[in-house]
């Protein structure tokens, strides 16, 4: 049996990313700490997240093809990302990972990679 070469392949590819992002933005759209920094219509935000996570976890480089180099910190600088919002974002992602039923060791690997990224995105101290 061939072992998957990437997290993307191991979790089932784009269909799983799509399910994860859909679940995630359902939580984001209802989270009082996150609503102020996200648009009312999350359609385009979710589309970009699908492209990013596909690439981030070893799938096709769709994000770069569509948007250029990720430069995620720079792209997020216009938004106040506090430790509190980082934690809210991670809580929404953890809930989405649970709902998507991504199995171990991939659930933990994904959450750890996204936790490091979320820490990197912080640009505003506690208020």
Describe these PLM feature segments.
Residues 1-127:
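Core of compact, soluble alpha-helical bundle domains
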């Amino acid at each position: 049996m061939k072992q998957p070469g990437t997290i993307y392949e191991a979790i089932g590819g784009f269909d799983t990313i799509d399910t994860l992002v859909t679940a995630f933005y359902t939580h984001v759209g209802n989270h009082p700490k996150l609503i102020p920094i996200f648009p009312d219509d999350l359609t385009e935000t979710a589309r970009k997240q699908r492209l990013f996570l596909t690439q981030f976890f070893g799938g096709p480089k769709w994000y770069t093809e569509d948007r250029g180099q990720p430069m995620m910190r720079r792209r997020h600088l216009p938004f106040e990302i506090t430790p509190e919002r980082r934690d809210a974002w991670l809580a929404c992602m953890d809930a989405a990972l649970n709902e998507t039923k991504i199995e171990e060791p991939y659930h933990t690997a994904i959450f750890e990679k996204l936790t490091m990224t979320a820490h990197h995105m912080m640009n505003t101290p506690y208020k």
